[in-house]
Amino acid sequence: MSQLLAAGGRRLSGEVTIQGAKNSVLPILAATLLTADTVVLRRCPRLKDVEASIRILEALGCTARWQDDALVVDTAGMNGCAIPDALMREMRSSVIFLGAILARCGQAALSSPGGCELGP
């Protein structure tokens, strides 16, 4: 078994740049529905699932725009509680919007999620 030994007693300092990750940003995009304020997500990756999430937000009446490497989401205009079937089928993780829509609207309507088929 290999080991990593760290000798203590020395102060750590410096900077680490954290890059955006799809598995982090998708739940955060859904969580933007929990506020009626503008949310700015810096170093947001421009991926197909992120774009699909943006289309879901827009279908609910929200706005989203790219500003350099940041995604600016404004949910003040949210006026719906149903995600269209076509958007639900774009990605398997679209179901993550359910909790935030329920919290904000008190009800939600969505079909089965889509995305890549898993298994035989």
Describe each PLM feature range.
Residues 1-120:
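Short, structured segments at the rim of ligand-binding sites
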